[in-house]
Amino acid sequence: MLNPIVRKFQYGQHTVTLETGMMARQATAAVMVSMDDTAVFVTVVGQKKAKPGQDFFPLTVNYQERTYAAGRIPGSFFRREGRPSEGETLIARLIDRPVRPLFPEGFVNEVQVIATVVSVNPQVNPDIVAMIGASAALSLSGIPFNGPIGAARVGYINDQYVLNPTQDELKESKLDLVVAGTEAAVLMVESEAELLSEDTMLGAVVFGHEQQQVVIQAINDLVKEAGKPRWDWQPEAVNDALNARVAALAESRLSDAYRITDKQERYAQVDVIKSETIEQLIAEDETLDANELGEILHAIEKNVVRSRVLAGEPRIDGREKDMIRGLDVRTGVLPRTHGSALFTRGETQALVTATLGTARDAQVLDELMGERTDSFLFHYNFPPYSVGETGMVGSPKRREIGHGRLAKRGVLAVMPDMDKFPYTVRVVSEITESNGSSSMASVCGASLALMDAGVPIKAAVAGIAMGLVKEGDNYVVLSDILGDEDHLGDMDFKVAGSRDGISALQMDIKIEGITKEIMQVALNQAKGARLHILGVMEQAINAPRGDISEFAPRIHTIKISTDKIKDVIGKGGSVIRALTEETGTTIEIEDDGTVKIAATDGEKAKYAIRRIEEITAEIEVGRIYNGKVTRIVDFGAFVAIGGGKEGLVHISQIADKRVEKVTDYLQMGQEVPVKVLEVDRQGRVRLSIKEATEQSQPAAAPEAPASEQAE
């Protein structure tokens, strides 16, 4: 009854298996993909009919990790998986971006892709496996899809490209690049790098695209054997007469509107033209559909903008193809934050802050691939007012998570190592205005805010978004694209880096036929733009400030013996808790005996260091200490001698005469001088009041308050 069809192939150092026909037979298509022991089950369901009035393509991609895949039970209260994590959201976007452009224009049937990680090898990331699975399932489904696509991860180790490196290899790699594309063209690139050259990055893209051809071939072979018949779907016939009528009413007016340089004014004028045109046409013929008219008007808009660019005319806002919008760069704009900057590029603006915290503030991520700690946090917020709209405000959406991750990639390469700068750093970018490339504005603002905070970043970084308009062999690469140019163009190509190289590259291509030469032109043009922006940024601040903010915690580091760690922590954390409250500092102890004391007040930090040194000091036999009685028992008294240490004064060592009752001589809390007689192998301390008194004050009674004793 169950007749699975299986295809295996070698992919770099891994063996990939594609299997269909075994599970989820009621889905439109389902594939189990495994790479070594990492397995992802991917299903696709497509609706045969579109919803009435549907005017956009409702594609949903869900990626979900099951903890059983790693042999674990979820740690949440309900012991089951909850809403998608940030990592799951990012991988869902990674799957979505290369497949979305391959559905035909006009196809608006609902399609859902669900990728479930069911087994994981900690050395093999499931993201590439899930992308291959989505490509295979869509290709098998019969849904109109111009795939398949392949996907590959490329590393760069010892000046060599590595296909699908393991997690251990990635730690040694200067590059982590994911590339996806069809047999003929690259569609998507997502990467972070340690300031590599444009040629090295382009080489990685080409290498990954070449290597993934084996994936595409394997999927094609599977489709030949197990694929479903392609749906009999045809786009709606073009109504040439209606198109001509709409163009006659609106084309020249839209062309004039797209010469208005102010975004809000332009949008208002375009909306007026559209509504008046639709209103007039429906008045003439009530059978016309407003959605269809809207699509025709959108096509006219697109043609107006694109034809103007291809003809070499000025862009929407009057710029030439390689011009950058006006820049305004300010630092230290918020008085009490640790670091802040306001970066404005045309009608795109980011208010960026940097906050310093201790290692305790780092984020602990309990991921399927294992637990890790992240000491550099980057959060991107895109409120509705940034584009002059109203809307919901709440938890971050997929787009905000994706843009924040891209901006973080852009800055990560220049962040200092924790051993040199032992702070957790959080950067927050508030997009206050947006008209294209707000994620790259966040990179620029983050670099400025980090410098303002005194974070010793290795170099300043800046980001730029490039666009493309291509018709046949004629193409134009645009620098610093507007939102409209992104929406109406063929490519969104974001590059971040320093003067020395690229730290992040993200590319989304909406058409096939983007050649290596076009990517080379875009990278070189982006480099010129990046260097221009860095030049302007350096006029505002050209190096990290010499000291961190007075409002930031200063971290002081001392070293103690590892066998003294338990003394500083105390039973159940009692000593370190009391120290923290007493000194007003934050104290962290590492396994190697490194102690980090964080305080905004230098005197408090010095006091905390002194107290820790007291606690960890070795008890000297024969030395006299000032002590305080902490417990009284029948056979003597326990006396604390500082540093969390306590010793026993036997009843015979209280006075130079026979003592019948300890409480006749000592009271709780009384201060007394004590001499250390012995520290045994178990660390127990034997003390004497009698000898301390005889040595320092022979005639004094032991009840008298002890005075400070010299060594």
From Swiss-Prot:
Gene3D superfamilies: GHMP Kinase, N-terminal domain, K Homology domain, type 1, Nucleic acid-binding proteins. Residues 622-690 form the S1 motif domain. PROSITE patterns: KH_TYPE_1, S1. It holds the Pfam family KH_1. Mg(2+) binds at residues 486, 492. Its cofactor is Mg(2+). Residues 553-612 form the KH domain. GO terms for cellular component: cytosol. It is an enzyme of class 2 (transferase). Its main location: cytoplasm. It catalyses: RNA(n+1) + phosphate = RNA(n) + a ribonucleoside 5'-diphosphate. One of its GO terms (molecular function) is polyribonucleotide nucleotidyltransferase activity. Its EC number is 2.7.7.8. GO terms for biological process: mRNA catabolic process; RNA processing. Disruption phenotype: Increased stability of speF mRNA. Residues 694-711 have a biased composition (Low complexity). Keywords: Cytoplasm, Magnesium, Metal-binding, Nucleotidyltransferase, RNA-binding, Transferase. Belongs to the polyribonucleotide nucleotidyltransferase family. Involved in mRNA degradation. Catalyzes the phosphorolysis of single-stranded polyribonucleotides processively in the 3'- to 5'-direction. Involved in decay of speF mRNA. Component of the RNA degradosome, which is a multiprotein complex involved in RNA processing and mRNA degradation. This is Polyribonucleotide nucleotidyltransferase. It comes from Salmonella typhimurium (strain SL1344). The gene is pnp.
